[in-house]
């Protein structure tokens, strides 16, 4: 947890002794979610591929008395997802909550400017980790006859200049609906939290911003930064609340879906986007 806990969660203890895996827990929404679930009593498994980031999150959690461990893993492969679930189960004996947070736009540009390799990399980063983690955790949750899976979606499915990323997030929406129907009989709930524009001050995953019409080889850092600001302003103007969200606000929605307060909610998408249209 950061220097301060989220005061909005004061007194909430909805996840006491629940074993919660948070993928991509080393930064942004993932780190905020690990903090929130830990603050509510969860035992947290921080999964990330960057050791320094995961270590920082775990240290913050432990500083506030939260039981936490890290697993360094590449979730772009099924073997990596299986290893994560095995380590979590070995450490705690069960898995109650899985938050699939690993993803992130790499390139922002019109679709015709993407190379085939770039498309594959976008899908590998933003779809496959969620798909593999769901597949790997299912046998464990089916055996328990319980579990809550919360996927992190996006408002990009109705936006511009991120078609491969949006395709990944659209796939996650389909995965959520179908899994909820198939595995509800096992007591497993599956939902998605779809954030809008969110300020991520601790982002370590790079993005390549290219003004539409500018080829990738012509990348100009100053122009890219100007384009980033223009895009942020454009997204903000689409939001009813006229501001970008905070990771802690996204984490609050995830904590609700993960908890028994949402015990009769499955197959749903909660848009935590400030009214983004």
Task: Pin down the residues of each PLM region.
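Conserved glycine-rich cofactor-binding loop
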Residues: 19, 26-27
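Amphipathic alpha-helical dimer-interface segment in Rossmann-like NAD(P)H-dependent oxidoreductases
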Residues: 86, 125-143, 180-181, 185, ...
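Active-site helix of classical SDR
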Residues: 134, 168-171, 176
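Conserved mid-core segment of classical short-chain dehydrogenase/reductases
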Residues: 82, 105-120, 143, 161-164, ...
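Short, small/polar-rich loop/turn modules that mediate ligand/substrate recognition or access, typified
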Residues: 184, 189, 265-267
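C-terminal substrate-recognition "lid" of short-chain dehydrogenase/reductases
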Residues: 14, 92, 131, 146, ...
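Catalytic Tyr-X3-Lys loop
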Residues: 112-131, 146, 150, 172, ...
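Short C-terminal tail/terminal secondary-structure segment
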Residues: 2-12, 108, 254-255, 266-277
